[in-house]
């Protein structure tokens, strides 16, 4: 297959996409045509997009348009979320996998009159038990707990003016390495289990405004603004980073 997803780091659980054989830094990730998963958000970006939140995914292989940035070398992957105008007013999903990963999702679309609509999205997931199937002393997948919430709004005016804006907040905690690792007790001279602790907090907000400039709405002018704040704290062994 030309699109694959793999672990780049089994200790932290970071994942990356390979498109046409090249790693994820050459693939542009888009959130409804807005560039996403940049900088500190890149290693765990895929983990912060619950599958049940998505309506569709579009994959464009090869050199793509530079309208949304110039980092697309092997292609673009655009994710379309559930819309405020979704016909399903309430969606609930829960799953427990055989590796004890638990996953809960909710999506609720609300119509606030003829012009306004909104969608509320919620996600809670976690790995609550360690496992080491290959018996190498290291956890095959890190313990993790994630809370992810989002609220998206749509205004559609009678003249064709559209305003879309939203807010998303998440907290992700991961503990990898050897089972029993505690950064408060670990020292370089000790024989205590080695591991890593990661706490990642992220806040994202955006606004998109489209104004038609022709009678048939075939032409329009748009304004897009996006802001992401990422706060990551990492402890690996006795060292603290970021």
PLM segments and residue spans:
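Extracytoplasmic beta-strand/coil segments of soluble accessory domains associated
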Residues: 1-35
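Short loop/turn motifs that connect adjacent beta-strands in outer-membrane beta-barrel proteins
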Residues: 68, 84-89, 113-115, 158-162, ...
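Short beta-strands and strand-coil junctions in structured, solvent-facing domains, enriched
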Residues: 4, 26, 36-37, 63-67, ...
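Short acidic/polar hinge/loop motifs at secondary-structure boundaries
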Residues: 34-61, 149
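Flexible loop and strand-edge segments within Gram-negative outer membrane beta-barrel domains
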Residues: 127-148, 154-221, 227-242
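Transmembrane beta-barrel architecture of outer-membrane proteins
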Residues: 14, 44, 54, 72-74, ...
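N-terminal periplasmic accessory domains that precede
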Residues: 1, 15-18, 30, 44-50, ...
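Predominantly transmembrane beta-strands of Gram-negative outer membrane beta-barrel pores used
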Residues: 28, 56-60, 76-82, 89-98, ...
């Amino acid at each position: 297959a030309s699109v694959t997803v793999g672990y780049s780091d089994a200790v932290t659980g970071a994942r990356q996409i390979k498109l046409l054989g090249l790693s994820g830094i050459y693939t542009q990730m888009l959130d409804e045509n807005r560039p996403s998963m940049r900088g500190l958000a890149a290693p765990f970006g895929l983990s912060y997009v619950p599958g049940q939140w998505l309506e569709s995914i579009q994959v464009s292989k090869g050199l793509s348009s530079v309208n949304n940035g110039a980092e697309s070398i092997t292609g673009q992957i655009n994710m379309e979320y559930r819309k405020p105008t979704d016909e399903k007013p309430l969606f609930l999903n829960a799953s427990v996998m055989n590796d004890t990963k638990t996953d809960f999702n909710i999506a609720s679309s609300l119509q606030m009159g003829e012009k306004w609509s909104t969608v509320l999205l919620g996600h809670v997931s976690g790995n609550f038990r360690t496992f080491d199937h290959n018996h190498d002393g290291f956890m095959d997948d890190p313990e993790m707990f994630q809370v992810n919430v989002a609220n998206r709004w749509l205004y559609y005016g009678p003249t064709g003016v559209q305003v879309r804006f939203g807010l998303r907040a998440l907290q992700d905690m991961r503990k990898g390495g050897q089972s029993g690792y505690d950064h408060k007790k670990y020292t370089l001279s000790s024989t205590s289990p080695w591991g890593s602790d990661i706490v990642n907090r992220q806040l994202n907000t955006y606004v998109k405004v489209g104004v038609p400039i022709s009678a048939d709405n075939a032409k329009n002018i748009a304004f897009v603004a996006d802001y992401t704040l990422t706060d990551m704290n990492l402890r690996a062994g006795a060292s603290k980073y970021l």
